[in-house]
Amino acid sequence: MSDGKRIVLTADRSLMTNYRGNFLYGFIACGPYELIPEFVFDKLFCPSVETNKNTGEVKVAQCGLRRIESALLKEYQRDEIIISHPEMLEKSIGPNTTVVGINVMDPLGMAPVTTTMSPEKLSYVAMKFKKMCASVIQLKKKYGFKVVVGGNGSWELAKPDRMKIHGE
């Protein structure tokens, strides 16, 4: 078991991909979750970024996460900070973790493209955020760290009742 990094940065699984180099695949993530089986979506359209299987650290991350990491490195040591894959958070989080920062693009599926492609339905982007939240909530109960959410889609979570959907 890891003692965890002091600061853990992450994003939901729909953002931890390069969409096979085809930006149009990013739009597929805005589609209804029920349309394509999740394993097909993950394998075909949204393959995971390269990740260290021992630590959960991603090799490539969104620019916003790297900017936050860079700013934090002015005050903290490199070994205190990690950008972790959302499906491997348990490898990065532990008793030493004080904060988990989450970058979001469209966490509740309320952005224009998503509401157009998935009206009244759960989109992949929202489902991936929901899955990550379930993991973060369980780890937070165990270790008591703070959670900070930011990014282009953080406006979707501005009303307190919206996070109750995810258990916080």
Question: Where are the regions a protein language model picked out?
Answer:
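A short, structured N-terminal alpha-helical element that caps or precedes a catalytic domain
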Residues: 1-167
